[in-house]
Amino acid sequence: AVKAVLGAVVARKGPPAKVDVWAGLATCDGTRRLFGELEDMTGVPVIPLHLPSTRTAEAAGYYAGEMEAFAGSAVERGFSEGWDAARAGAYEAAFRRAAGALRRAALSGRTGPVELTDLLMDFSAACPTGGDAALFGRIERAESRERSPTYRVALLEVPGAPGDGLVPEALSARGVGMVALGCGGLWGIPEGPPPPAPSPGDLAREYFEAVLCARSRPNDYVFARLEETVAETGAAGLVVSTMRFCDMWFAERLRLRTRLPVPVLVLDRDLSPAGRETAANRLDAFLDSLEASL
């Protein structure tokens, strides 16, 4: 996914060609080192930021401070005219209203896995105050076409390259429902209304505490939330799909299988044809075993 973005940036094609400044958000040293290269290759400034992978109160405070500093730096460097708290509150309120339907779809497991994945990906780049009526119409139609799957599988996945829908495609082919977790799904949408006039730190803290993904270090808090969500959705199994360079969850696969009350498959993936074939075979075997046990 990083290489795909870099290719588009260097080729100056698509949305990356229109960027005036990058907010470089990284959880690991490998990505942080990329930012200097990105600035050198494109001539576009990069403001580096660090996203702690461990979810704790201290880390939330650190991240809130990072976002406050980022907003100040953007003003100092002439990229922003300043933070408009009222406008930020209105934007966030519109975003959460629109995201509510997607949250319900991600939680229910009744919207088709491929369609749900496409909607979540499109929504991540949508502007809720910019009249994205076509997208919101698609969300409403997806809700109205809710189906009754044979069973549901929860998916916690690192967002991959567009079109890499290995797990959603496999679930869809079997008529299985998908409960989409992670930062691109249910766990990427905070619940409840935002503050009416939030500061950058207010929103950063709220999102840091609410949003979990496969890059979040699996400490006791994350495990407890995962157990709670799996029980709440009635998922019959859990698939954790991470990239090979991001192995925090793969290292915890034994604890996952011990603590979760449902069967668990942990995929340690790459995007090569051989890697995709191996992951597809393991996923098929897991679903066969899961169906045999129901």
Where is each model-derived feature located?
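Trp/Phe/Arg-rich N-terminal binding region typifying the photolyase-homology
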Residues: 1-74, 82-83, 178-185, 189-294
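A charged, amphipathic alpha-helical module
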Residues: 64, 68-192
